[in-house]
């Protein structure tokens, strides 16, 4: 059976990487919104309204995704912190043992 070793530092690195990617995602969605607004100013009719409605729905989904990824990053950081606290307690207990 394969063994996977994870350290709190690796969890923190993964959280930071994911956070950075999520910030890039947010920037791209903001760029898309700006372009969609500019496009809507040049366009009229039912097709414009349909496109704008679809974009608004997609935009809400992208925002929800961004929020969920942010929450996941926070959970990863909390996991790393709890692991470090447990590790410190265990080291203290082990160091205090005498025979």
Task: Identify the residue ranges that each predicted region occupies.
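Amphipathic alpha-helical hairpins/coiled-coils and adjacent low-complexity
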Residues: 1-99
